[in-house]
Regions:
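Mid-to-C-terminal secondary-structure elements
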Residues: 5-7, 22-37, 50-182
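Glycine-rich loop motifs involved in handling phospho/adenylate chemistry
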Residues: 41-44
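His/Cys-centered metal/cofactor-coordination and adjacent catalytic loops
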Residues: 47
Length: 183
């Protein structure tokens, strides 16, 4: 899961001011299913699922956004050789208040073209979040120590700070019923 570039997007004479869109892979949707209220889940790279509140800001009815092409806008003085183009595939319900996933959209990016051994490609890691499900019997503290020591052995990552937060602590603030549900 990685944050967007910090640029505006445009569509149909609308300027979408610095949207909080995140690139995710198909496993994100399986681990963190979103409640789809219009359209479908992203099926192809650069398909995007917008939050209902974001769609309402720019379209009269949220479902009117479906099929729209959102193009990354290059600010004056910047050059982007391949601006991101996203196609709206669906509208998701806004996340509950106790969720740490309060983003305005998730777009599919299953690209396997990245050369992760090239240190220049790691410059974007500061805005990247990786979510893991540990196998049964793996202790969080043991896994954390092993992962952190392994990451810091890589020369290209010596100056990068990592933190590992258990999802149940990061993602949920349990209410009295101690459960989480979209319904």
């Amino acid at each position: 899961m990685a944050g967007n570039s910090g640029f505006d997007f445009t569509t149909e004479k609308k300027n979408l001011k610095y949207p909080d869109f995140w690139a995710v892979d198909s496993l994100f949707m399986k681990c963190f299913p979103q409640r789809i209220i219009h359209g479908t889940e992203p099926a192809h790279d650069n398909d995007i699922l917008l939050s209902e509140s974001f769609a309402r800001k720019y379209w009269k009815h949220p479902q009117d956004a479906i099929g729209s092409l959102l193009t990354q806008k290059t600010p004056s003085g910047f050059y982007i050789p391949n601006p991101i183009q996203l196609r709206v595939s669906g509208i998701m319900a806004d996340a509950p208040e106790n969720s740490s996933f309060q983003h305005e959209g998730y777009y599919l990016n299953n690209s396997e073209n990245g050369d992760y051994h090239n240190k220049e490609n790691w410059m974007y890691i500061a805005n990247t979040h990786v979510h893991l499900v540990l196998k049964e019997g793996i202790r969080f503290n043991d896994f954390s120590q092993h992962l952190l020591s392994s990451l810091h052995e890589m020369e290209i990552l010596k100056n990068v700070k990592f933190s590992i937060i258990p999802l149940f602590q990061k993602h949920f603030e349990f209410a009295a019923e101690e459960s989480f549900s979209y319904s």
